[in-house]
Amino acid sequence: MSAHPVDTVTAATATPDVAQPFKELGLKDDEYARIKEILGRRPTEAELAMYSVMWSEHCSYKSSKVHLKYFGETTTDEMRSSMLAGIGENAGVVDIGDGWAVTFKVESHNHPSYVEPYQGAATGVGGIVRDIMAMGARPIAVMDQLRFGAADAPDTRRVVDGVVRGVGGYGNSLGLPNVGGETVFDESYAGNPLVNALCAGAMRVEDLHLAFASGAGNKIILFGARTGLDGIGGVSVLASETFDGDESGTGRKKLPAVQVGDPFTEKVLIECCLELYAAKLVVGIQDLGGAGLSCATSELAAAGDGGMHINLEQVPMRATGMTAAEVLSSESQERMCAVVTPDNVDAFMEVCKKWDVLATVIGEVTDGERLTISWHGETVVDVPPRTVAHEGPVYERPVQRPASQDALVANTTAGLTRPESADELKATLLKMLASPALCSRKWITEQYDRYVRGNTVLAENADSGVIRVDEKTGRGIALATDASGRYTALDPYAGAQLALAEAFRNVAVTGATPKAVSNCLNFGSPEDPGVMWQFQQAVRGLADGCAKLGIPVTGGNVSFYNQTGSTPILPTPVVAVLGVIDDVHRRIPTGLGLEPGETLILLGDTRDEFDGSIWSQVEHGHLGGVPPKVDLEREQLLADILLAASRDGLVSAAHDLSEGGLAQTVVEAALAGETGCRILLPDDADPFVTLFSESSGRVLVAVPRTEETRFTGMCTARNLPWVRIGVVDEGSDSVEVQGQFSVSLAELRTTFEGTLPALFG
């Protein structure tokens, strides 16, 4: 027991005027006053710790909640028809047919990944994996969305090295394939990288588990790793003191607020959980992530039909002298909290013993309505659990379109110098291919295991990851994540829809049917009205887009305060789309050359759209104007045609067009298939626009000559624009833009793949 005096509920009642460090814990004056109003007294030290972490921006969504409700308002009953769990649960769950369900979610671990890149990224992966485990599923794949400062900035190498090793080290050790994602370099992320991790899990529909504590007398069991000092206050400012200072005269060094992960403990925990689920030993379950036991106990109790009592001294600790507040606030990793009936406790413990997982009964469900916590026989917490978990402050922050937005939009690319000659076009292609914005991410992805477990069908560098779920039928899923901070900065509403459209298209390109969306909304300070305008517009754009496409948002995450000083990051709404494919054997790959003499057909309209483009960034360091037009009805039509083409075997390869335009897509497809091709520019087309425009809603498909008439006839009949843009020449070792230039595959590969190893290898 800590030598620190215990602040009990009795003591708090008797000493109402004791000064408390609520501001140091991130609480405002009015929030502290509200806590005292709820309790009818001042909070104890332990209660104050609980409220401070649970009412933090990260846990309470206090600045975003008024806007996030728009997702629910725009979701129809039809959209919800295949959704088994949605917003408010640990992760969304979707019925994918044949008795299977898939759960998926994106979470952020941004700030810890700057302070301690390896552990920040590793525990970001570990945390999202436990969210998936808590739904009753076996985790089957991970993805990541990474944002770093300028590639040549002094500190970027440190952050990139740690984050990539952290993502790979944790995911690889768990035996989870990393099937895709994005990595972006931009100076706005210097000092504030983004690490957004996605995990997907699969289960039978009847195996779904939810987080609630029900049934008076049922036991609360904490199992997994011991509880330590690492991660205290990771979601608030509980660890705001300097890391090397002495803490409270205890003689202990204060550890950073970044958690420390052990993937091998988590791997065993996964198998233990799955056996517990199979044996029907779990009533309710919650992982311990942000806010630790404060979150797990209050959320379980708030979602149940009674109260809860916890004997906090029963929590297994790996540090001596911890206080009750520290135990409640610790974010030590690899821990779960389960609700178990008394007659199943012994069987539960036997399963944990089999897997060498430490498990301890720390409390029970009560027939009251309060969450009480004792510490060595004295009550240190006595609260209504909903006030901790769900009834925190809600702010309607000022929303104001920035005055600078007009100038940003007016600053178009119209006056920028464009390449005209064949040599200039070739030089532009090679410069863009070699740029950190577009170069190969192979140096990163090769540090991840993409095919472990044997169910990965497509992974990086495909447009989406495709994973088999059912070995017997071949049923599987496709996952894609996308975001564009540049487009969102120009128009947050359109930028969010462009990210949605691309992720939707990336799933459709593989032959899968898009079914559901998760998101991770990364923005600057909510106290800035301009940032809140960006956030509001992005939420509305994403919600309206999902409604138009008929797919629901099943959950997500909001990360605010992503800025250095007063300069926010580019607004970055990350969108993840889950698709279903009834047989992974009919998936459409990216690489050319599967069929000799394939015809290359470009689907969709190409317009002169360069505002916010990678070309404007790489060639001119420019950001301004209006982002490309979004046509979600066209995206749906495109998806329908790709699905039909996949089922009928009409296309042998497909790759979506996005950053870098047609030129980038052709090079990636040619290198993936190790096959050259000829690009035939339309006579009336501007070569620069054709090659580098970033118009949305376009896909390059390779069609066997025997199927060309059927495929183009289907497109014409459904009013989808198409143009025959090239041919795959058997045995060709170059990409030729007829009438302009030719580049060998060897030069393209060297140019494309050499940048990141030179910078970070």
UniProtKB/Swiss-Prot annotation:
InterPro entries: PRibForGlyAmidine_synth_PurL, PurL_linker, PurM-like_C_dom, PurM-like_C_sf, PurM-like_N, PurM-like_N_sf. ATP binds at Y61, K105, N519, G556. Mg(2+) 2 binds at D131, D287. It catalyses: N(2)-formyl-N(1)-(5-phospho-beta-D-ribosyl)glycinamide + L-glutamine + ATP + H2O = 2-formamido-N(1)-(5-O-phospho-beta-D-ribosyl)acetamidine + L-glutamate + ADP + phosphate + H(+). The active site is at H58, H109. It is found in: Cytoplasm. Substrate binds at S108, H109, N110, H111, R130, Q259, E331, S332, Q333, S559. The keyword ATP-binding applies. It comes from the Bacteria. Its EC number is 6.3.5.3. CDD domains: PurL_repeat1 (cd02203), PurL_repeat2 (cd02204). Keywords: ATP-binding, Cytoplasm, Ligase, Magnesium, Metal-binding, Nucleotide-binding, Purine biosynthesis. It holds the Pfam family AIRS. Mg(2+) 1 binds at E107, N557. Part of the phosphoribosylformylglycinamidine synthase complex involved in the purines biosynthetic pathway. Catalyzes the ATP-dependent conversion of formylglycinamide ribonucleotide (FGAR) and glutamine to yield formylglycinamidine ribonucleotide (FGAM) and glutamate. The FGAM synthase complex is composed of three subunits. PurQ produces an ammonia molecule by converting glutamine to glutamate. PurL transfers the ammonia molecule to FGAR to form FGAM in an ATP-dependent manner. This is Phosphoribosylformylglycinamidine synthase subunit PurL.
